[in-house]
Amino acid sequence: MKKKNWIYALIVTLIIIIAIVSMIFFVQTKYGDQSEKGSQSVSNKNNKIHIAIVNEDQPTTYNGKKVELGQAFIKRLANEKNYKFETVTRNVAESGLKNGGYQVMIVIPENFSKLAMQLDAKTPSKISLQYKTAVGQKEEVAKNTEKVVSNVLNDFNKNLVEIYLTSIIDNLHNAQKNVGAIMTREHGVNSKFSNYLLNPINDFPELFTDTLVNSISANKDITKWFQTYNKSLLSANSDTFRVNTDYNVSTLIEKQNSLFDEHNTAMDKMLQDYKSQKDSVELDNYINALKQMDSQIDQQSSMQDTGKEEYKQTVKENLDKLREIIQSQESPFSKGMIEDYRKQLTESLQDELANNKDLQDALNSIKMNNAQFAENLEKQLHDDIVKEPDSDTTFIYNMSKQDFIAAGLNEDEANKYEAIVKEAKRYKNEYNLKKPLAEHINLTDYDNQVAQDTSSLINDGVKVQRTETIKSNDINQLTVATDPHFNFEGDIKINGKKYDIKDQSVQLDTSNKEYKVEVNGVAKLKKDAEKDFLKDKTMHLQLLFGQANRQDEPNDKKATSVVDVTLNHNLDGRLSKDALSQQLSALSRFDAHYKMYTDTKGREDKPFDNKRLIDMMVDQVINDMESFKDDKVAVLHQIDSMEENSDKLIDDILNNKKNTTKNKEDISKLIDQLENVKKTFAEEPQEPKIDKGKNDEFNTMSSNLDKEISRISEKSTQLLSDTQESKTIADSVSGQLNQLDNNVNKLHATGRALGVRANDLNRQMAKNDKDNELFAKEFKKVLQNSKDGDRQNQALKAFMSNPVQKKNLENVLANNGNTDVISPTLFVLLMYLLSMITAYIFYSYERAKGQMNFIKDDYSSKNNLWNNAITSGVIGATGLVEGLIVGLIAMNKFHVLAGYRAKFILMVILTMMVFVLINTYLLRQVKSIGMFLMIAALGLYFVAMNNLKAAGQGVTNKISPLSYIDNMFFNYLNAEHPIGLALVILTVLVIIGFVLNMFIKHFKKERLI
């Protein structure tokens, strides 16, 4: 067994020796002596100095122009022939400094262009051009580098001064051009105002004059018409239209004989029917029934023969008896009893209210509910005002009356909602006074969001509809021009043929001389055109009908037919629909909550008034006790009233008796009449004699009727004449009204055109004002800080004379050109190999001697855990001691500056502890596999070192753990990056390695691990 262990040890030792020799040969071959390279670069003069340029500058904008001074600086260096410059990334430059590819790295910072163009700043910030030299360079190389950087910087500063002067001159030229443009725009606006709006307004009163004249003329004709019509009606005699009703006018003369015969025949038939039906009438039954009813009435009347005095006497006796009973009743409550009862009842109620737990609980519950209600109400008001970070839509904008009017409300509504906004501000101030500063609330600033909500135009769009009929003999082409801010959906129908709504030219059928145009579609606003659309808030669609391919002859006086069908939709009202409704809803909700808040605000929590309640209850009981006497008097008054009304009651009874008597008399008369009818039916009826000579009376009636009709005809002729005259006047009135309607339409069209022109002119003037204001604002900034009061701004002067300064990125290493330094790569490699040897020593001891037990087994059940912790501590302490020794040696070799030594030694100690703990764990736990992993990490590091070329870092660097340690030491020694995060990570890895070594699992049988 021991022989086998020594074989393992020998193999591992050989592997380590081979790795060390290979590493030394590789490092010597790759890096060599940097001091020797420095001497060679001096001997090969300046053209052997390689300078890496790292351009991190970001472009900026000045006076509307893009400025990239980083590129200009690189172009300036390209003209330098004495040195070799290369533009690379920062990682490539740092790698080049590390492996000797570059001797100098010049870094153009990110804000280089922005800081260089601070011509308008009062105190410009300094611009620094950063540079760094490679570690271990000779002093002569460093001096030459400083000289190169200084010379290039001086030349570049001269160019910057020229750029500043050019910029100032350009600003003056731009100002001159803008002033000329302002004058041109003002002249154009004045000319357009005169021709486009002022002259049409001067002609506008003439339209009112024409309308007034036509209105007066039409009024005169209407007055004359009504006067004539009234005169005709008044002159007409109503008797003229009255027909003599003594004659049967409905019977026509030419049919009188035939009708007379028909009537005579009908009469004969009626007599025959009478004779045949009279026997079927049973009058005896009716007469007997009425006699029986008459006898019943006699019996009832005999029973009601009591006189009026008897009725009256009976009623009086009953009322007197009732009055005596009521007067005999006395009140059971004396005055003393009432006062004693009042006192006892008051004391009892006071005691009950004071000791009633249910009542106290109810009062406390009311107080708690009121407090909870006030708290909830304040929260609702807070939520109504404040805009939450998420998609909250129940907040209130700080809008003024003008903002509401601009959003589409009338003045009354704007005043109403402005008052609600003021209430919100008032509540906000009260709320902030009660709350700490961190909980203060504010209304959301309003930036025209409500008046510029284009969501409905983007999602729903606007309907585009138009119907037009165009007549022309020479139109053969349609040109469609759509608004570039909108996407159009739909079609254009030309005589039933469909075309899409898009920019296009369509050849029309020339056989038609009439084109029926129908436009039906939807225009949706493009999201990326929202800003441009809000400038005029109008959607345009132009349909231009014209004649294509026509070449006008010089003598051809016939103009080309062009019909422009343009649709212009001003969508100002659509921009505030949804957002305005949402805002008004939020304001209404706040107003309702605020009214409840003001109603409950002034109420104080007063104690419950028990005394008032007790007095009210006692007074109610006492009043009922004292009201007995009043109730008795009221009943006696009612009895007296009944006695007074007894006569009327008796009269009603007697009147009913009289009505019964009258009914009896009527029945007797009816019986007598039926007896007479019975006698009449018993007799035979006489046939009437018809006088045939009565026909002459019909002739007389015909003559009279003819006279009446003649009179009516004369009057109707006169009325027809008057009607014709009225028609003539009505036609004249109609013509005047048509002319008046045309004048009104013309007046309306002119007013609408003037409104459109005024809006166009207003938009142009507003645009000119905006451009002028922008120019004044921008021109005001030009060199506004060139003076500090009455004196020249010395800071700006110093900046413009020497804007860019150099800044040396110092290294942690002492830059001694006569001293050789060790590479961080070799340093990290030696540390890792030392940790591998240490780990193998611990592993070999444990295999030979067994696990280290510092505490006896019979001491405690937790001895194994304590032994493992002590073992991990010993391993970690070994790494700490080795790290301290290696750190002190490396500090002297690297010549670390005094202020950086403590951190450097701490980094070395933590790195060494991580290496020792992790490698020891791998060997103790997974043995041969652990050794393989350790050698694999070392091999990856070798491959990564071979890939450290100027081309950049490869994938191997990203997966090699030792490469990260190498970069950490390199960055620290070159003062490139802070190491705080690196120290934290190393500390965490030390803790992990310590814990892993505490939990080693030992296997009973030998396995691969």
Swiss-Prot record:
Its main location: membrane. InterPro entries: T7SS_ABC-Transporter (IPR051328), T7SS_EsaA (IPR023838). It is found in: Cell membrane. Keywords: Cell membrane, Membrane, Transmembrane, Transmembrane helix, Virulence. Coiled coil: none annotated. It comes from the Bacteria. One of its GO terms (cellular component) is plasma membrane. The chain crosses the membrane at residues 7-27, 822-842, 869-889, 903-923, 928-948, 979-999. It is a multi-pass membrane protein. PANTHER family: TRANSPORT PERMEASE PROTEIN, TRANSPORT PERMEASE YVFS-RELATED. Component of the type VII secretion system (Ess). Provides together with EssB and other components such as EssC and EssE a secretion platform across the cytoplasmic membrane in the host. Homodimer. Interacts with EssB. This strain lacks esxB and esxC. Belongs to the EsaA family. This is Type VII secretion system accessory factor EsaA. It comes from Staphylococcus aureus (strain MRSA252).
